[in-house]
Amino acid sequence: MEITWYGQSCFRLTERGSASVVTDPFDHKVAGYGALKLKSDIVTISHNAPGHNFVNGVKGYKHLLDGPGEYEVGGVFITGVRTNGKNQTGQLRNTLYVFDYDGITIAHLGDLREVPSRSQVDAL
């Protein structure tokens, strides 16, 4: 398992024989990091903001996950759970993702604003 951090909330997860994942790709003009030039099978977006949803920084992806649900892609089981955190219009705005790579489990919290509730943790 290889986990690479690119800045902000953007990581790439790779495991031999499984789909690769990029989380929360950022627009470098907003985030203040170098421009992303990544390749991945899956992109996850925790919420709709330029620092977390710049899919133009990722090439080759076939699956874009931008909300809660259960997914299975390329040997990776992914669970997305809506968590608390409100945007300027008062809407729920963050999805926490849990990735299971054949026994290796990783959580990406996105732009989590507070500790998840018991029911949110149970949903994982």
Feature annotation, model-predicted:
Residues 1-42, 49-51, 61-123:
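Core dinuclear metal-dependent hydrolase active-site scaffold
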Residues 54-55:
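Terminal membrane-proximal soluble interaction domains of membrane-associated proteins
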